[in-house]
Curated annotation (Swiss-Prot):
Function: Required during biogenesis of c-type cytochromes (cytochrome c6 and cytochrome f) at the step of heme attachment.
Protein's name in the database: Cytochrome c biogenesis protein CcsA
Cellular localization per UniProt: Plastid, Chloroplast thylakoid membrane
A cellular component term, taken from the record's GO annotations: chloroplast thylakoid membrane
GO biological process: cytochrome complex assembly
Key words of the record: Chloroplast, Cytochrome c-type biogenesis, Membrane, Plastid, Thylakoid, Transmembrane, Transmembrane helix
InterPro entries (alphabetical): Cyt_c_assembly, Cyt_c_biogenesis_CcsA, Cyt_c_biogenesis_CcsA/CcmC
Pfam families: Cytochrom_C_asm
Keyword Protein transport (UniProt): no
Record keyword Translocase present: no
Entry membrane topology: Multi-pass membrane protein
One GO MF term attached to the UniProt entry: heme binding
Amino acid sequence: MFNVQFDIFNFSNNITFLTLLISLISYWLGLIFKKIKNVFYIGYGSTILACITITIILGTRWIESGYFPLSNLYESLMFLTWGLLFSAIYLEYKTNLYLIGAIVSPISLFIVSFSTLSLPQDMQKAAPLVPALKSNWLMMHVSVMMLSYSTLIIGSLLAILYLVLIKAQQKKHSLKDFAFANLEFTFPKSTNSTNFNLLETLDNLSYRTIGFGFPLLTIGIIAGAVWANEAWGTYWSWDPKETWALITWLVFAAYLHARITKSWTGERPAYLAALGFVVVWICYLGVNFLGKGLHSYGWLN
């Protein structure tokens, strides 16, 4: 049984890498060469296939280990990639905006490459859970946090892309210099189909995506506090991960506050979202490389 699962695991890893590479190439060929737009369908299909293979990887490990596969760095990286791909697939389906896949495929390929090629084999293997992780809160807290990271990352990437394009426009470079400049955004299932230009599209979609990810982040932090009280007798201990999770929450709370109450649009909230992109990665990966705190187990040791 183990050998069969191990073969499925390796095969799925290879297929995931290959499909993400095809997805990346397809999307960017479509953006650079406007006459071959049909290549976007190859990119989208490859993204779906990559998401399926990661599902197989995580499902196989779940069956093998007997617990939800979120106990070490490799598993969390793969789950984060799954969240990124699933979110991109859904958003692209709803909006027909292929730029989403074009910006998500590179970061997904990088994460998968790092997790499968850079991490030592010992860190990729499922290991027995430490006592503190033997709880139903493992799935509730960690999975929700990872899903919030994936949606917040996509929302932030869209905001960063918005800033790149607006700066190019301000420097008197027409957006027509970009291969994707003439894309229009349509709400396919809206009663009144509305077309927006590219910059308005990115600003609006970034706001909506972050608006979805922020409640997930809030729920994940609350679930983690409840779990911490059960495991260590305290809801909050100012662990490095907890501190940076709070900083992440505050950054995106400021973003949504500015959008909702101050009616900010355009560049100003985009800068906040770009800051959030950096903060999310510090919270997720940077803190763990310190090897300190309650969240260091199962990651680098």
